[in-house]
């Protein structure tokens, strides 16, 4: 009789315990993170500051930035809250001057069928999630080129690789961001600058939590069924990814070991795009 099968490790559907994380000293480097007041941006700002970077934390939410600054006070790197609305494109570009590491993260979401999608919201989504990253990269590259080193990390999404119904603006913006990131990689390579996307699936963030009601209305189901029947229906790992997990991937792309990685997308989707 064969022995019964035993588990070979932790349940992949459960988040792993917090580990020490990557060891990387970013002392002397300046990082800029957009959408830093919450979610993925907050996690990235704190992780980079923990590695010693001077972090410009950009957001339009003053209260969230104030909370973030308090959380970062004991970390090795300095964190500077910067109140900025990314629809002010000239100000966005100017804010990126002198940046060594740029994390384009800010985003917004509205779930509606195309025929009901407000054109002004579509325009705002594309402005914040595609045109602003272009302007920020444009503002950061002269300094990066001048010193022969730079890291551009664009927080994309599985929706930069695949489409979903009712998300026309978000999907269009993320697909555009993937193309912008690849172009920056090709242009930046001779100057020591890498550009990559980190493309997570559904992350435990306020943005995802806010869209559950919209998804329920769009699909005609109760909100409590959205996670299992819509968001995670096609994922192999049936859980939301944590913001800290995304931040570790961002940090990895700033390590010397990742210097040959450019023009690609690091997908953290629990197998969502394997179909």
List PLM regions with ranges:
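Substrate-binding pocket helix/loop in short-chain dehydrogenase/reductase
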Residues: 113-114, 118-126, 152, 231
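Conserved glycine-rich cofactor-binding loop
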Residues: 30, 37-38
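Active-site helix of classical SDR
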Residues: 137, 173, 181
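Short, small/polar-rich loop/turn modules that mediate ligand/substrate recognition or access, typified
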Residues: 189, 194, 261-263
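C-terminal substrate-recognition "lid" of short-chain dehydrogenase/reductases
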Residues: 134-137, 141, 149, 237-268, ...
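Residue(s) in the substrate-gating loop at a strand-loop-helix junction
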Residues: 157
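Short C-terminal tail/terminal secondary-structure segment
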Residues: 2-22, 162, 250-251, 262-275
